[in-house]
A protein has these predicted regions:
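Structural motif
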Residues: 9-11, 182-186, 232-233, 319, ...
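Active-site-proximal N-terminal segment of extracellular/periplasmic enzymes that hydrolyze or transfer
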Residues: 1-42
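Active-site neighborhoods of enzymes that stabilize oxyanions during catalysis
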Residues: 263-377
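Metal-dependent active-site segment of extracytoplasmic phospho-/sulfohydrolases and closely related
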Residues: 7-12, 17, 210-250, 375
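Short catalytic/ligand-binding loop motif for oxyanion handling, primarily in non-cytosolic enzymes
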Residues: 17-20, 58-60, 72, 192-195, ...
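Acidic/histidine-rich catalytic neighborhood
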Residues: 228, 237-277
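His/Asp/Glu-rich, glycine-adjacent segments
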Residues: 54-198, 210, 283-284, 290-294, ...
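Short, solvent-exposed turn/loop segments enriched in Gly/Ser/Thr/Pro and often Arg
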Residues: 33-54, 63
Length: 378
């Protein structure tokens, strides 16, 4: 006999509002639908925002790498001569991924950790942000996260390390016990798919239909075992097709300034972040980046509005943001541009996240941080 109530939230990384509306994702069974403003930045900052209801300036996570030589876990790289790290070998993705695993194990990091394409000689001046698992109790301490709020309840939060298919299977099994009260199903693989295939409509449609079928089956399982089911699909951002590339590293290399001495830069895919050990370097950097075009410097007011105005400027004293569709290539995250990217202005239509549900919430979410309050309200 069906009894009880379950509240289930399916998080699908990169399932943007424009995608859900274009292909009517879940339109037949999730009638309550609205666009939701993303958190400026990448998943490194957006996911903690969903898990805490706070912006990056409060929960402390924004981008993976930041300038902090005193606490850098890569200080030992200073002792390795360049000849011991030949680019032909150590710049290969598989080698870097393998080394990332070794470093993660050595330090006991439990969060997502990857070296990406950061030059070896620059790593000793950089620290890494996500050293703890964000999805477990205390993962964002001293800020409370979702796991802290659901502690002591019959709840299931998916293992982000597992595949989306495995997480659907696990949540289905938990639902069938008839005892689950709260569920957060993590699906991270659509993000990688859209990075590669966003410009291929047929492939995108087929992948979305595959996810839609899984979501529909999960909802049906919940209805078979619970009297009351509150079910929602949520996301963190969308995906924007590639429009062009900018070589910021080449422009900076032409300046008579030394990286690590007069300035420090970190080029994410869509933004360049700068610190100035020598403040006199600031005007030349600002002028050089502005001359590249296809972007602009964020004002202090915009950083405040975006929730990234860190008092210590931890993630950058200055930030240059590219226009939607443009990418830095090469960047410190990868040598080549991807067919799709996110991390643009939150107001850009392609950046917007989604909320799709079978129930009307007490207050519709306007910003992805509002998902936390939906998931934790009594």
């Amino acid at each position: 006999m069906k009894d009880g109530k379950v509240r289930l939230f399916v998080f699908i990384d990169a399932l943007g509002w424009t995608l859900t509306e274009h292909w009517n994702f879940g339109g037949g069974f999730l009638p309550v639908r609205c666009p939701v403003r993303t958190q400026f930045g990448y998943s490194a900052g957006a996911v903690p925002t969903i898990l805490s209801g706070r912006p990056p300036a409060e929960h402390g996570q924004f981008s993976f790498f930041f300038y902090q030589p005193a606490t850098s876990p890569f200080r030992l790289f200073r002792l390795l001569p360049a000849r011991l790290l030949p680019a032909a070998l150590f710049d290969r993705h598989r080698v870097r991924h393998w080394l990332s695993k070794l470093i993660k194990k050595y330090y006991g990091y439990t969060g997502y950790f990857e070296l990406y394409a950061v030059p070896w000689e620059r790593l000793p001046l950089l620290d890494y942000s996500e050293k703890r698992d964000l999805f477990v109790p205390g993962g964002l301490a001293p800020i409370k996260n979702l796991a802290d709020c659901w502690a002591g309840r019959n709840a299931c939060i998916s293992n982000w390390r597992c595949s989306s298919d495995d997480n659907f299977a696990e949540m289905t099994a938990r639902l069938k016990t008839g005892q689950l009260q709260y569920g957060f199903l993590y699906c991270g693989s659509l993000d990688g798919f859209l990075h590669r295939h966003i410009a291929e409509p047929d492939a995108v449609e087929a992948e979305l239909k595959r996810y839609e079928a899984k979501v529909a089956a999960l909802l049906e399982t919940a209805r078979q075992h619970y009297r009351t089911v509150e079910f929602a699909v949520i996301s963190d951002h969308g995906m924007t097709p590639l429009a062009g590339t900018v070589d910021g590293n080449a422009a900076l290399a032409r300046l008579p300034l030394r990286w690590g001495k007069e300035y420090v830069s970190f080029l994410d895919a869509t933004m360049a972040r700068f610190w100035f050990p020598d403040p006199a370097a600031r005007p030349a950097i600002r002028e050089t980046m502005a001359a590249l075009g296809h972007g602009r410097w964020l004002s202090a007011e915009e950083q405040q509005t975006f929730g990234i105005a860190f008092p210590d400027r931890k993630y950058g004293e200055e930030i240059y943001l590219l226009e939607p569709g443009w990418q830095f290539a090469p960047s410190d995250m990868g040598r080549a541009a991807l067919p799709g990217m996110h991390g643009y202005e939150p107001e850009h239509a392609g950046s917007t996240a989604c909320f799709l549900s079978n129930y009307v919430p007490a207050k519709r979410p306007e910003w992805i941080g509002d998902f936390f309050h939906l998931m934790t309200e009594d």
